[in-house]
């Protein structure tokens, strides 16, 4: 999912790109039955990969996939599993003096019940956060933006020039 959209819908692997795919559990019919899914394994792969690569892009599918089931308690467990996995990722990035962006392209698990009590199993259009984790987080300003701003933000943090084709702008600027 992340790979396909990050690559502009292209399935073919680009030169210099490695893909590490962690399969979701197949032993359950629906993910409310295993809301932790593969979050711990994704975090372990991230911790290994961040030592080797300048950029690692990953996806925790828990909130989305479990959110589609409409089972609130499972949704909470899914988010807790991601929280635990992210703790490991954040610790590793900070140990290395790196920077981490955490975001999503849509909501789901944050709104699993409609006003009438029926399950909401669809993606939401709620705003999503962009969380910046780094040792210098107190020396930068993080602006509000849109999804088109995420890639320019990543390029900016890497010190790379933004292509003219990108219409967004960096959401992280030096200074408070």
What residue ranges belong to the model's regions?
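Feature captures the catalytic ectodomains and active-site-proximal regions of enzymes
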Residues: 2-176
């Amino acid at each position: 999912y992340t790979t396909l959209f990050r690559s502009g819908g292209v399935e073919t692997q680009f030169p210099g790109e490695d893909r590490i795919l962690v399969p979701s559990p197949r032993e359950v019919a629906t993910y409310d039955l295993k809301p932790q899914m593969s979050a711990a394994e994704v975090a372990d792969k991230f911790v290994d990969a961040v030592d080797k690569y300048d950029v690692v892009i990953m996806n925790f599918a828990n909130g989305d996939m479990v959110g589609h089931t409409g089972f609130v308690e499972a949704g909470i467990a899914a988010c807790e599993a991601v929280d635990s996995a992210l703790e490991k990722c954040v610790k590793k990035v900070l140990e290395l003096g790196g920077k981490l962006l955490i975001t999503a392209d849509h909501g789901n698990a944050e709104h699993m019940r409609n006003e009438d009590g029926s399950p909401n199993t669809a993606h939401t259009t709620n705003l999503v956060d962009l969380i910046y984790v780094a040792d210098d987080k107190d020396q930068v300003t993080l602006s509000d933006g849109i999804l088109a701003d995420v890639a320019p933000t990543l390029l900016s943090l890497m010190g790379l020039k933004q292509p003219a084709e990108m219409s967004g702008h960096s959401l992280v600027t030096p200074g408070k």
